[in-house]
């Protein structure tokens, strides 16, 4: 009997080093008119100590699928690495790229099967020529939610009102970039575990584009007066 990708998903999480470094984090993703955009801050903390100010919390899984990571840095890096491995196996076995739904389902199953040992919240998003852009949220515990807009991490609690008031479907790319930039910047101002810079990934029929926003650069982070 042929071995499937799912048959190989027997991961010994106990063998994975539990890291103290955590990504308190603000992670977001949305579906816009032509694809999807993912965005995140870049602060990594260890208790009250800021361990890294420029962490890249956006991880490429395939050519057209990326994920945002929040929770334990060690756990989420390992989950993302395993996802990349399984998705590459899927392509070899079936002869075509996996769909965003397939990638999100694998991530959800991995997190659910090990929910008592992992501290990992993910957003999986990507572009598929058949379905367009898709966004899936996988919070702690491993449940799977398909949404036009997903937010997660400690900073998300501070921007639900902003997102409810300002998000709308079928935004243009420019509108979507501005919306996510403002959302993450607002979370960074209020959440002590979010900060640093803002990184984005835009996925559409033309491929992938990355954006970077930082203080005192040509692409500055928005500053809000109180």
Curated annotation (Swiss-Prot):
Catalytic residues identified in the record: 25 (nucleophile)
Alphabetized UniProt keyword annotations: Cytoplasm, Hydrolase, Nucleus, Protease, Proteasome, Threonine protease, Zymogen
Signal peptide boundaries: none
Catalysis performed (reactions): Cleavage of peptide bonds with very broad specificity
EC number: 3.4.25.1
Gene Ontology biological-process annotations: proteasome-mediated ubiquitin-dependent protein catabolic process
Pfam families found in the cross-reference section: Proteasome
First-tier enzyme category under EC: hydrolase
Domain of life assignment: Eukaryota
Gene Ontology molecular function terms on file: endopeptidase activity; threonine-type endopeptidase activity
One Gene Ontology term, aspect cellular component: nucleus
Positions of the pro-segment in this chain: 1-24
Location(s) in or outside the cell: Cytoplasm; Nucleus
Family (UniProt): Belongs to the peptidase T1B family.
Role, per record: The proteasome is a multicatalytic proteinase complex which is characterized by its ability to cleave peptides with Arg, Phe, Tyr, Leu, and Glu adjacent to the leaving group at neutral or slightly basic pH. The proteasome has an ATP-dependent proteolytic activity.
Quaternary data: The 26S proteasome consists of a 20S proteasome core and two 19S regulatory subunits. The 20S proteasome core is composed of 28 subunits that are arranged in four stacked rings, resulting in a barrel-shaped structure. The two end rings are each formed by seven alpha subunits, and the two central rings are each formed by seven beta subunits. The catalytic chamber with the active sites is on the inside of the barrel.
Protein name: Probable proteasome subunit beta type-1
Species per Swiss-Prot/TrEMBL record: Schizosaccharomyces pombe (strain 972 / ATCC 24843)
Upper taxonomic lineage: Eukaryota, Fungi, Dikarya, Ascomycota, Taphrinomycotina
Gene that encodes it: pre3
């Amino acid at each position: 009997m042929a071995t499937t990708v799912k048959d190989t998903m027997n991961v010994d999480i106990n063998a994975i080093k539990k890291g103290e470094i955590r990504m308190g984090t603000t992670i977001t993703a949305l579906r816009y008119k032509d694809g999807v955009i993912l965005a995140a801050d870049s602060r990594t903390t260890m208790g009250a100590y800021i361990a890294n100010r420029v962490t890249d919390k956006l991880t490429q899984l395939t050519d057209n699928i990326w994920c945002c990571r929040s929770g334990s840095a060690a756990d989420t890096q390992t989950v993302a690495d395993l996802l990349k491995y399984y998705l590459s196996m899927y392509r070899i076995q079936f002869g075509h790229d996996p769909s965003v739904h397939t990638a999100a389902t694998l991530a959800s199953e991995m997190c659910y099967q090990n929910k008592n040992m992992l501290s990992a919240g993910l957003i999986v998003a990507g572009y598929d020529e058949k379905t367009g852009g898709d966004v899936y949220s996988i919070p702690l515990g491993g449940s799977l939610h398909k949404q036009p807009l997903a937010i997660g991490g400690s900073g998300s609690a501070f921007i639900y009102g902003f997102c409810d008031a300002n998000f709308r479907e079928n935004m243009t790319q420019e509108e979507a970039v501005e919306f996510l930039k403002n959302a993450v910047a607002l979370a960074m101002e209020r959440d002590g575990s979010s900060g640093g810079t803002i990184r984005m990934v835009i996925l559409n029929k033309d491929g992938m584009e990355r954006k970077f926003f930082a203080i005192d650069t040509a692409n500055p982070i928005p500053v809000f007066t109180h």
